[in-house]
């Protein structure tokens, strides 16, 4: 295998890649951003609307069959060097039932693990992304056991966009696996779970599991993050200046898409209704254009305001936060384009017009951070 690897590098052949649970293309955008010479030979995704978005941007429609119906022979025909996987996270979330492998949504990933030893050419590399909590699940135990038996070496990470200069708190679990004799560039990190991206940049001052950054470490991270205003498509306004939002609207219009769920064609339709502010104001996470941290956007953003993502104050008060009247801060939702910006999607990414606003937020909430995944993939493919 090492000779084949050397031959590939010398001949500059593109890596052949399979993309599982492709969604709206976050993994593929990460692969492109990494600079790796590669070719996605097939993508797999069961969601029809997500495939519409993927096809719109990549001119290729993913295979839409059930992954559980795949056989080892099916996978062999792709002759892929690497498998990239972002399986459903619901079995492992804190809000979910935490059934782990007992959740039906985990079955397809378990099926893929079962197939690896039966393929004639197992992938040289695997990349798995999931929520924090996956690392303590029985599915994780099954995955590591399978990979170890098949001579894979793993390096695991829990990383957030905040560690890459993006003001977005979205910690996620990542597993990088390479089959012997392929080595990782930093072998000090073999078979460890790290909370630091240092190995990606050739540094060994790693933060291992259980030694997560303290608050002072987080404060230092935020110093290097860009402000929220760099990720906005709609003008931000500060210091109580008049908003470009149409003042004839009081924000009481339903922002949750109950009037056809069409995509707003004017700024005021992203304003948070006063009724929601009065009811849920204390539970809202408010950020400002100069903020350096934004909460994770979930698939329920725009449908619910509690715990689904940050809201932007379009009028910045003299005193920030809930001490000031929230209704006077003209809170609005971040637009889908802005959420895509926080996920570091490229400027040319777009949704087909028929995809509703709720669908856009839901798909973005299920996606991943290109800013985090691209350097991880670069590190994985680097020999």
Swiss-Prot record:
Transcription regulation keyword on record: yes
GO CC, alphabetical: nucleus
Keyword check for Nucleus: yes
SAM-dependent MTase C5-type domain location: 15-383
Main location (coarse class): nucleus
Localization annotation: Nucleus
Active site: 89
PROSITE patterns: SAM_MT_C5
GO biological process, alphabetically ordered: methylation; negative regulation of gene expression, epigenetic; tRNA processing
InterPro entries: C5-MTase (IPR050750), C5_MeTfrase (IPR001525), SAM-dependent_MTases_sf (IPR029063)
Catalytic reaction list: cytidine(38) in tRNA + S-adenosyl-L-methionine = 5-methylcytidine(38) in tRNA + S-adenosyl-L-homocysteine + H(+)
Molecular function via GO: methyltransferase activity; RNA binding
Enzyme Commission numbers on file: 2.1.1.204
Self-association state and partner proteins as the record states: Interacts with type-2 histone deacetylases (AtHD2s) HDT1, HDT2 and HDT3.
Similarity comment text for this entry: Belongs to the class I-like SAM-binding methyltransferase superfamily. C5-methyltransferase family.
PANTHER family (alphabetical): TRNA (CYTOSINE(38)-C(5))-METHYLTRANSFERASE
Role description: Specifically methylates cytosine 38 in the anticodon loop of tRNA(Asp). Represses gene expression at transcription level, probably by regulating histone deacetylation and epigenetic regulatory network.
Protein's recorded name: tRNA (cytosine(38)-C(5))-methyltransferase 2
Classification lineage: Eukaryota, Viridiplantae, Streptophyta, Embryophyta, Tracheophyta
């Amino acid at each position: 295998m090492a000779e084949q690897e050397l031959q590939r590098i010398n001949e500059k052949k593109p890596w052949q890649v399979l993309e599982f649970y492709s969604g709206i293309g976050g993994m593929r955008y990460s692969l492109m951003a990494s600079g790796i010479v590669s070719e996605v030979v097939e993508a797999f995704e069961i969601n029809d609307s997500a495939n519409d978005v993927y096809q719109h941007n990549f001119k290729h429609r993913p295979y839409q069959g059930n992954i559980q119906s795949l056989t080892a022979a099916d996978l062999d025909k792709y002759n892929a060097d690497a498998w990239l996987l972002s399986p459903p996270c619901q079995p492992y979330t804190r809000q979910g039932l935490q059934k782990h492998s007992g959740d039906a949504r985990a079955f397809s990933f378990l099926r893929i693990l079962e197939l690896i030893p039966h393929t004639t050419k197992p992938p040289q590399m695997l990349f798995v992304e999931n929520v924090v909590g996956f690392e303590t699940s029985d599915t994780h135990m099954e995955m590591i056991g399978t990979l170890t038996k098949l001579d894979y070496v793993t390096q695991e990470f829990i990383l957030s966009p905040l560690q890459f200069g993006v003001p977005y708190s979205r910690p996620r679990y990542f597993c990088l696996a390479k089959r012997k004799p392929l080595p990782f560039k930093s072998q000090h990190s073999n078979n460890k779970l790290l909370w630091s991206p240092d190995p990606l940049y050739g540094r060994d001052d790693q933060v291992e599991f259980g030694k997560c950054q303290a608050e002072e470490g987080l404060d230092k991270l935020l110093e290097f993050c860009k402000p929220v205003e760099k990720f906005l498509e709609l003008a931000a306004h500060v210091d109580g200046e008049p908003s470009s939002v149409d003042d004839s609207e009081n924000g009481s219009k339903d922002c949750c898409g109950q009037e056809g769920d069409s995509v707003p064609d004017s700024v005021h339709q992203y304003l948070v209704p006063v009724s929601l502010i009065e009811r849920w104001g204390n539970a809202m996470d408010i950020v400002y254009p100069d903020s350096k941290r934004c909460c994770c956007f979930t698939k329920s953003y725009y449908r619910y305001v509690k715990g689904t993502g940050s809201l932007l104050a379009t009028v910045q008060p003299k005193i920030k936060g809930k001490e000031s009247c929230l209704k006077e801060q003209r809170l609005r939702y971040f637009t889908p384009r802005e959420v895509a910006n926080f996920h570091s999607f490229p400027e040319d990414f777009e949704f087909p017009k028929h995809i509703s606003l709720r669908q856009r937020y839901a798909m973005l909430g299920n996606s991943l951070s290109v800013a985090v995944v691209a350097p991880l993939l670069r590190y994985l493919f680097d020999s």
